[in-house]
């Protein structure tokens, strides 16, 4: 009888350690994904052909208030985080905090590094090269961060909540959300261009490609 109890306790402890280890690996995967997508954003910023709607709006707002992107985006994210927390706390996880806190600062950091290494993209060819590199890196990082499944970014949590409240399809709500934020980005003078539309409406297939071909396989090893 004692042996059975000891075996059960050992199994429970092992299972607990396994879950903790898996969570740590998923958290690391989310962290690396956010790091990579931020690097991609820095190349898109250098291309000067627009950014994703949310970052574009934050860049415009931070410029108007003479603040660094990291500080401004953290404040905006915190406000959205409170909304998501009280609306559907199940969407919140360690990945939410990682994305909320780090992305703005990492874009600043990688932009400085990219500028020191490669300089200004002062021709259309260099702009296109930076845009393509940025999109590839950004979508891979976004796929990795989402595949880790340890919480969504505050901005990404808004559409599912509104969709549930209004009974509209998620995709419809997300498109409306992005269009509204695109308009806001334009009004506050954020980087607005062809990349803004591409990231908002056309990157899904590339993110799915990275998920299916690479990141889901990494996740399955955890």
What are these regions (language model features)?
Residues 2-222:
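Core subunits and conserved enzymes of cellular information-processing
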